[in-house]
């Protein structure tokens, strides 16, 4: 096995993920030089949902306590570990649903979870939310929702990797990168 290729992949993947997470923080009005007000109800012209407001406030509190770079780096490591664990579980058929999150059975990046969404049984899955995403043809948000729900379901089995705080306080969920289907 060529370990240098794996190391390069991990380093490059980490750098890309860090940039994507920092971009996501930026979308919520959080920058290294200015984290903004924790009680904001609107950011960059977009009104925040109650869940987003709570998660954003928790993120700002974490940044104020530990610094911007350290917080973004921590979230990057958390998501990197979650993605690697999900992929490992997917390839080895360890996921409780036995439905792949990142690929299809042939290994192509065509998430089975999107194809089997109407038959999916997962703890915490909101069928009405799924129907709304499908109705609005919002595949990216549907995929994001399914991936986050899969992570939340796995926290009982693997709390060290998939630990989420109270759902409204877990800012790592807020920072999961956009365009995860790209």
Regions found by a protein language model. Give the residues of each.
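Charged, often flexible domain-edge or linker segments that flank or initiate folded functional domains
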Residues: 1-182
